[in-house]
Amino acid sequence: MSDHHGPLRVGIGGPVGSGKTALMDLLCKSMRERYDIAAITNDIYTKWDAEFLVRSGSLTPDRIAGVETGGCPHTAIREDASMNLAAVAEMRSKFPGLDLVLIESGGDNLAATFSPELADITIYVIDVAAGDKIPSKGGPGITRSDLLVINKIDLAPYVGASLEKMDTDAKRMRGARPFVMTNLKKSEGLDRIIGFIEEKGGLTPRRSA
């Protein structure tokens, strides 16, 4: 997919605190040896997430861009994605061989989605700490994302959440669309997410890890 229209673009959305930035960090560090990668983050009035990725050493700083969306962060990934598209274009001009661009949305609700013009694949991250009813509430992120990530499964016993209920509800709401349960703090489930991106996106490693 990265050959005929530029790099594969993966949009990562989800509520504040669900683990979007942690997933961005892990994907960059796990895939950068095999693929040419850039990362773009969205924040309302700051570039905190981009700065976190720089401090973490996810990628070299010139491969990380922060977009300050202002106002409503949903608009910058959906109705008017021009700022993000410009950031992608700038990365492509700096790194013509890009295979993959990861785009993290600003903190958004269950109704936020990525424009097909901006993201080829969408991943939506929710977390167990928000309650086991989240999958049953639906919304485009839950029902229509290409991959749903149910993160922080290690917290289930502490917040009284049933992983079985979340599993059942996710299957009911998503039908044939896949989901994965993760503990990104320990990289549990990360391999499945990477495998999904590679298979769905048609990525071919340029070099061995």
Swiss-Prot record:
It comes from the Bacteria. GO terms for cellular component: cytoplasm. Facilitates the functional incorporation of the urease nickel metallocenter. This process requires GTP hydrolysis, probably effectuated by UreG. InterPro entries: CobW/HypB/UreG_nucleotide-bd (IPR003495), P-loop_NTPase (IPR027417), UreG (IPR004400). The gene is ureG. Its main location: cytoplasm. GTP binds at residues 14-21. Transmembrane segments: none annotated. Keywords: Chaperone, Cytoplasm, GTP-binding, Nickel insertion, Nucleotide-binding. This is Urease accessory protein UreG. Homodimer. UreD, UreF and UreG form a complex that acts as a GTP-hydrolysis-dependent molecular chaperone, activating the urease apoprotein by helping to assemble the nickel containing metallocenter of UreC. The UreE protein probably delivers the nickel. Disulfide bonds: none annotated. It is found in: Cytoplasm.
